[in-house]
Amino acid sequence: MKPILPLALLLAACSQQPAEPTLTTGVFAGKGSGDRLCIAGEPGNYRGGLIVFGDGDVNCSASGRIEVADATLALVPRGEGECRIPLSIDGGAIRIGQVPAACSYYCGPGATLSGNAFSLASQAQTRDGSPAKAVDLAGDPLC
């Protein structure tokens, strides 16, 4: 009878793990006309991408997986070991926190990710009236 008690306690402890939060997926628009963030996938397998423009066509752009740990989110660019772009959900907006120096590779001179905010762009359209999309400078999808 004694071996059953530790097994029961172990199973009870495992069942109390918090589930990964469900994120709203789709395209989010930033303050600039081309600033976009996208989230796709499902819990445990989210991916994301973003592009933020500075002056002219100078920009920051990255895509990869969305890492969820405790109450924090981060975009981890593909092939990256050190860069974690911190994200937070603030009501209906997604905000980028203070981006570490390890992520500077993803920005051109004068462009920055830190402090940008994005709102769900379900009805947002581009200048020519087409639906908003999250694409890089070459037109390739970020998600």
What does each of the following model-derived ranges do?
Residues 36-69, 142:
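N-terminal glycine/threonine-rich, aromatic-flanked beta-hairpin/loop signature
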Residues 11-13:
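C-terminal motif of bacterial Sec signal peptides marking the signal peptidase cleavage site
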Residues 1-8:
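Sec-dependent signal peptide recognition
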Residues 81-129:
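Surface-exposed, polar helix/loop patches in the mature regions of secreted/periplasmic/lumenal proteins
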Residues 15-17:
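Bacterial signal peptide processing site
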Residues 54-100:
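Contiguous, well-ordered beta-strand patches that form the walls/edges
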Residues 20-29, 44-49, 68-76:
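Short, hydrophobic/aromatic-rich segments at coil-to-beta transitions
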Residues 20-37, 117-127, 131-142:
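Tryptophan-anchored aromatic micro-motifs
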